[in-house]
């Protein structure tokens, strides 16, 4: 038997919104320690990894390890039926072919119950190696989303340059070029969620397809800040915290010069 009850059901709705445009189907792996998910997008360019710890749920029960194959589009449709203040419960029997989703209003005057068919998925878990990064930038989630949206009007790729002075995002295209630079600001008069921090051991400059960064930025409602971890020639990591219960990480391989020349 698997059962997970989340008082702040809106967090689960936000997680679903953050995943559905990148991953069409995925295995939700449930153990006694929580729920995890790892999947690549259909073009195998980006990878998403989700962790929700058991202690973040009001009730969490998982009698035996369970891999639930879920159609993300179907789940998104059902999740839209839940109110933002609803309590959400996920429930499945061992070896079940259905996932039960229960939405309870916070006042207790409405109880909705849905069943969703599970899929048989053959998912290969990729080992994500531990990595020390040359540069880690933390900035407001909304600011990151705005930068990605703005520069996507200019070009299809964004160059992220990280130095001790700050981080710069730049793009160029047929209409011209644009760049946005953020300097570190961590003063006591600045709210924590509005701060920009840069931890750097060596300068980094990498190029990425901006359409993926725009998809990652859909996780912005989950957390007031986002962390970008970079090193030359390794995938970028974009990490959002999920309340006090876990995180969602996106991995995106940088574009190499040959690819950039073909795109231009």
UniProtKB/Swiss-Prot annotation:
DNA-binding region extent: 61-80
GO cellular component: PCNA complex
GO annotation terms (biological process): leading strand elongation; mismatch repair; regulation of DNA replication; translesion synthesis
Cell location: Nucleus
Coiled coil start-end: none
Keywords, comma-separated and alphabetical: DNA replication, DNA-binding, Nucleus
Record Pfam families: PCNA_C, PCNA_N
GO molecular function: DNA binding; DNA polymerase processivity factor activity
Signal peptide region: none
Function: This protein is an auxiliary protein of DNA polymerase delta and is involved in the control of eukaryotic DNA replication by increasing the polymerase's processibility during elongation of the leading strand.
Subunit structure: Homotrimer. Forms a complex with activator 1 heteropentamer in the presence of ATP.
Similarity annotation: Belongs to the PCNA family.
Protein name, per record: Proliferating cell nuclear antigen
Organism encoding this protein: Styela clava
